[in-house]
C-alpha cells in the first residue's frame, strides 16, 4: 500500500458491481484515503437508486451524495444536441455520450464541496467513457488527480470482482447470470455484451428492455402532437411540460409502439468496434418532431448548414469534447438557427415507425400558392430557363472545352 499523497477522492458511484468493488480497493491501495461516493440521478432505473447511499456506506465510503440532475440533463445537455440533429455514424442518438460530461461536472462540484484532491471513475480501459470523464475533468478541474482503477488493478472479470467483494463481506446484487453490460438514463438504455459480441448473432428478446417488439406492438396506430418552441420540445398533446416531463411522456408512448430501437456496430474513439442495442423511444419522437418543423422553416442553405453542424457535433460529443470551445461554437450556431424552429407536429406511431403526418408553423416558408401542382398566378414558368442556364454554366463551358480537343 502506498500513500500517493491523496487524502480524499470522489468516486462516480452507481451501486453496480464495478463501483462497489472500487470503494474498498481505493481504501486498500491508497493509504489513509477517504472515499466519497457521488451518485448522479439522470433518470436511471428507480430500483437502482433505492438504498444506494446505504450501499455505498456499507462498501466503505465515508459519505454518499445523490445529485438529482434529471431536468438539467435534458434541458442543458440533450436539448442543445438535439437542436443540431446530431446522430453519431448516422443512427446513434448519443445517450451515454451526453450523460458523461454532466456526471463529470457533478463530481467536480462535490469535490469542491468536500475538499477532495482526486476524482475516480469506473470506466474500463477499452471504452470511450474513460476519455469522456478525464477530458471533462481536465477542462473543469485540472488540479485534481484522477484515479482509473481499471487501468491499475488486476481484477479482470466479473468472477474476480464478485470474489473480491465476497472476501470482504460486502453485499451485492450482481451475479454471473447478468451477462449484459447496460447503461441507462432518461434518454436511452444501451445493451452490450453476451450474445451481441458476435455481429452474426441476432439479438435475443432480453437484449431489449424498454420497448416492445414492433411485431407485438398495437395493431392500431397512435397519433401524438408535439409542440416545439425555438428548437425545444415544450408540450405533448397540448400539455405544457418540463423538458424531462416531455421526455417521460414520449418514452412511455414510444416504448409501447416499439419506437426507437437500433442495433449497430459503432467505431469507438479508442479504435475498437463495438456492437450495441440502443433504445431511445422518446428521443426518436422528439427528433422527428424537430425535423418536421425544420422542413417548414429553414431555407435550403440553413438546412444544409444545420446538417453539417449536426455531423460535427456528433463527433465532438461522442469523443468527450463537451467542454471544448468547438462544442460551444456548434451549439451557438444551432441555437441561432433554432430561433425560427417553432411549430406543431402530429406524428403517427405504428409498429416501430414514427411518421410526421401533419405540421404547421407561423414561421413556415412553405407557400401553397407557389407549391401547387395546379394552376397558379404567382409563378412564371418562363423564369426557370434563365436560372437553369446560369446554374449549369460551368458544366456547359467544360463540355465546350472538351469539344475543342
Curated annotation (Swiss-Prot):
The entry marks the following residues as binding L-aspartate, namely 124, 128-129
Output the Gene3D superfamilies linked to this UniProt entry. Answer: Argininosuccinate synthetase, chain A, domain 2 (3.90.1260.10), HUPs (3.40.50.620), Single helix bin (1.20.5.470)
Q: PROSITE patterns from the xrefs? A: ARGININOSUCCIN_SYN_1, ARGININOSUCCIN_SYN_2
The record ties this protein, via InterPro entries, to: Arginosuc_syn_C, Arginosuc_syn_N, Arginosuc_synth, Arginosuc_synth_CS, Arginosuc_synth_type_1_subfam, AS_cat/multimer_dom_body, Rossmann-like_a/b/a_fold
Molecular function (GO) terms for this protein are: argininosuccinate synthase activity; ATP binding
Annotated localization? Cytoplasm
Give the matching CDD domains: ASS
**Which reaction is the catalytic activity of this chain?**
L-citrulline + L-aspartate + ATP = 2-(N(omega)-L-arginino)succinate + AMP + diphosphate + H(+)
One Pfam family in the UniProt entry: Arginosuc_synth
> Could you say which residues bind ATP here?
12-20, 122
Q: What is its EC number?
A: 6.3.4.5
The record's GO CC annotations read:
cytoplasm
Write out the pathway annotation from the protein's UniProt entry.
Answer: Amino-acid biosynthesis; L-arginine biosynthesis; L-arginine from L-ornithine and carbamoyl phosphate: step 2/3
Positions that bind L-citrulline: 92, 97, 128, 132, 181, 190, 266, 278
User: Which keywords annotate this record?
Assistant: Amino-acid biosynthesis, Arginine biosynthesis, ATP-binding, Cytoplasm, Ligase, Nucleotide-binding
Any Gene Ontology biological process: argininosuccinate metabolic process
Q: Which HAMAP family match?
A: Arg_succ_synth_type1
PANTHER family registered for this protein in UniProt: ARGININOSUCCINATE SYNTHASE (PTHR11587:SF2)
Its assembly, as annotated, is: Homotetramer.
Q: What is this protein called?
A: Argininosuccinate synthase
Amino acid at each position: 500500500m502506498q500513500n500517493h499523497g491523496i487524502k480524499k477522492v470522489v468516486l462516480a458511484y452507481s451501486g453496480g458491481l464495478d463501483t462497489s468493488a472500487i470503494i474498498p480497493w481505493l481504501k486498500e491501495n491508497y493509504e489513509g484515503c477517504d472515499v466519497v461516493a457521488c451518485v448522479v440521478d439522470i433518470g436511471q432505473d428507480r430500483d437502482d437508486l433505492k438504498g444506494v447511499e446505504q450501499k455505498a456506506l456499507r462498501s466503505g465510503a465515508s459519505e454518499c451524495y445523490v445529485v438529482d440532475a434529471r431536468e438539467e440533463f435534458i434541458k442543458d445537455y440533450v436539448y442543445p444536441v438535439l437542436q443540431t440533429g446530431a446522430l453519431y455514424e448516422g443512427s446513434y442518438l448519443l445517450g451515454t455520450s451526453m450523460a458523461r460530461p454532466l456526471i463529470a461536472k457533478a463530481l467536480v462540484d462535490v469535490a469542491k464541496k468536500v475538499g477532495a484532491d482526486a476524482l475516480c471513475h469506473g470506466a474500463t480501459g477499452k471504452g470511450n467513457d474513460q476519455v469522456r470523464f478525464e477530458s471533462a475533468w481536465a477542462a473543469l478541474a485540472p488540479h485534481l488527480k484522477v484515479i482509473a482503477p481499471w487501468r491499475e488493478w488486476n481484477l479482470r472479470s466479473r468472477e474476480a470482482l464478485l470474489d473480491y467483494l465476497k472476501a470482504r463481506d460486502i453485499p451485492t446484487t450482481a451475479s454471473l447470470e447478468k451477462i449484459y453490460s447496460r447503461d441507462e438514463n432518461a434518454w436511452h438504455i444501451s445493451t452490450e455484451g453476451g450474445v451481441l459480441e458476435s455481429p452474426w448473432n441476432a439479438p435475443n428478446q432480453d437484449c431489449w428492455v424498454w420497448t416492445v417488439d414492433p411485431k407485438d406492438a398495437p395493431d392500431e396506430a397512435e397519433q401524438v402532437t408535439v409542440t416545439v418552441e425555438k428548437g425545444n420540445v415544450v408540450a405533448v398533446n397540448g400539455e405544457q411540460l418540463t423538458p424531462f416531463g416531455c421526455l417521460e411522456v414520449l418514452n412511455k408512448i414510444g416504448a409501447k409502439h416499439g419506437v426507437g430501437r437500433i442495433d449497430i456496430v459503432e467505431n469507438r474513439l479508442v479504435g475498437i468496434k463495438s456492437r450495441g442495442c440502443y433504445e431511445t423511444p422518446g428521443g426518436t419522437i422528439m427528433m422527428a418532431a424537430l425535423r418536421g418543423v425544420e422542413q417548414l422553416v429553414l431555407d435550403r442553405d440553413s438546412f444544409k448548414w444545420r446538417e453539417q453542424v449536426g455531423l460535427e457535433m456528433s463527433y465532438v460529443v461522442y469523443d468527450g469534447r463537451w467542454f471544448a470551445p468547438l462544442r460551444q461554437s456548434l451549439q451557438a450556431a444551432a441555437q441561432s438557427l433554432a430561433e425560427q424552429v417553432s411549430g406543431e407536429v402530429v406524428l403517427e406511431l405504428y409498429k416501430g415507425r414514427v411518421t410526421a403526418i401533419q405540421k404547421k408553423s407561423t414561421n413556415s416558408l412553405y407557400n401553397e400558392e407557389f407549391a401547387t401542382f395546379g394552376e397558379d398566378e404567382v409563378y412564371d414558368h418562363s423564369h426557370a430557363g434563365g436560372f437553369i442556364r446560369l446554374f449549369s454554366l460551368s458544366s456547359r463551358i467544360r463540355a465546350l472545352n472538351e469539344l475543342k480537343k
